[in-house]
């Protein structure tokens, strides 16, 4: 029981550190798609419904991702909260997938994938395009096989 609490505390701390790393990097150098989506938000007068309708008729395959990117580009603090949750969910299955070293995946993600890797498109679009889907995938696999 104590080991389990320590593991959850560990992945929570790693999740917070990772989200803060992205947030700080984003504040220092907002680049790429993120700045473009801030302009889209102004263009649509921060009306997410109009943006969604426009994207649906122009590029519907990216509607969900671009809507999330627009929302998080405007509301960065919400992005930090959701990215902590997404990173936590990304690391949660590591206890089941690598029982001997459950802390290793979190450590490797934090060390091997630094925030500077995501500077071309911006922190928020990259997180929405890659970390969120990976989190959902591992979350679904974890709960699919958790009873086994």
Predicted regions and their residues:
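Start-transfer (signal-anchor) and selected internal transmembrane alpha helices
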Residues: 1-18
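Membrane-interfacial loop-to-transmembrane alpha-helix junctions, especially the N-terminal start
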Residues: 6-9, 97-105, 148
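Extracytoplasmic loop-helix module adjacent to an early transmembrane segment
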Residues: 17-57, 69-70
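Short hydrophobic/aromatic helix or loop-helix immediately within or flanking a transmembrane segment
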Residues: 54-85
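Membrane-water interface at transmembrane helix exits
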Residues: 69, 73, 95, 99, ...
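Alpha-helical transmembrane segments of polytopic membrane proteins
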Residues: 77-87, 126-134
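Transmembrane-helix motifs of polytopic, lipid-linked glycan transferases
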Residues: 84-103, 139
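Membrane-interface micro-motifs in multi-pass membrane enzymes
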Residues: 102-145
